[in-house]
A protein has these predicted regions:
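Auxiliary tRNA-acceptor-end handling modules of aminoacyl-tRNA synthetases
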Residues: 1-114, 132, 147-222, 226, ...
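Low-complexity, glycine/serine/threonine/alanine-rich intrinsically disordered linker
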Residues: 101-102, 123, 236
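Short, well-structured beta-strand/strand-turn elements
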Residues: 132-148, 241-245
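Catalytic Zn2+-binding segment of zinc metalloproteases
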Residues: 234-248
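Post-HExxH zinc-binding segment in Zn-dependent metallohydrolases
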Residues: 252
Length: 252
């Protein structure tokens, strides 16, 4: 890979379930677990830094400045952000108010294990943020594609994964400590997302729903729920701080 070195470990585990009743043989078998990783090279040309200043609601990295004052240390913070730049040959168009494609659009790859029926809702969640970027002059700043079967899930800069082992939704970022440039992000959508959100909705709005409960078993409703949750996670990996929702009913 041009950006680093990819490596994988495969480990095989054996298991045996004891007999549940006399004369009944226990279940046994093996399972192979693959652990992947990637050593990435930092960019040779550092992205320009941007201090937080009066900006509110953005993720940041704190650092200490030594030597500026003879008897003290100054604390400051850099905004955490992706490197989305305007191509040099399109700057005139951009200055005229035309929407332009960024030099390197951010591509969200969807892991192979993600069920196909949810892919349209993932696309919808990503395109929601494109409307935001259009407000600052970018066109199609975010793209979404399915990860090919022969490509390791550790290689994309932005990955949306389907987690069968963990019911929660989570994300993580890796960024350049000196510039705040985001280098990699991963969003995990837990298999238990819908069960958790159903319980949350009933807990917050059960008495106010007047008997017209939302049909969580509907694929359309489940897809719209995924779209909402995923759009919030995308906002966080784009550099926004977490915003807690006040009402599950308002969300849906």
């Amino acid at each position: 890979n041009d950006e680093g070195v990819v490596f994988t470990f495969n480990k095989e585990f054996s298991y045996v379930y004891p007999m549940n009743a006399a004369g009944v043989k226990g279940i046994e078998g093996t399972i192979t677990v693959e652990l992947g990783g990637m050593l990435r090279l930092l960019p040779q040309d550092n992205m320009s830094t941007k201090t937080v200043g009066n900006a509110q609601g953005f993720r940041s990295v704190k650092y200490s400045v030594y030597g500026k004052y003879p008897y003290g240390v100054e604390q400051d913070s850099l905004l955490v952000r992706w490197r989305l730049q305007i191509p040099k040959d399109k700057k005139k168009n951009y200055n005229r108010g035309q929407k332009v494609l960024p030099e390197n659009p951010l591509v969200f790859y969807v892991e192979q294990s993600f069920p196909d029926r949810w892919f349209p809702y993932i696309v919808k969640a990503v395109r929601y943020w494109n409307k935001v970027f259009e407000g600052i002059g970018y066109k199609d700043a975010l793209l979404v594609r399915k990860l090919e079967n022969d490509v390791s899930s550790v290689t994309p800069k932005a990955l949306i994964a389907y987690d069968l082992s963990d019911p929660v939704v989570a994300n993580n970022l890796i960024f350049h400590p000196a510039t705040g440039e985001i280098l990699h992000c991963r969003i995990n959508i837990g298999h238990g997302l819908w069960k958790e959100e159903r319980e949350r909705y009933y807990l917050l709005n059960g008495l106010d729903d007047n008997g017209s409960f939302i049909d969580f078993d509907s694929q359309k409703m489940a897809g719209e729920l995924l779209c909402r949750v995923l759009s919030e996670e995308i906002g966080q990996v784009l550099g926004l701080q977490t915003i807690e929702s006040k009402s599950a009913k308002e969300d849906l």
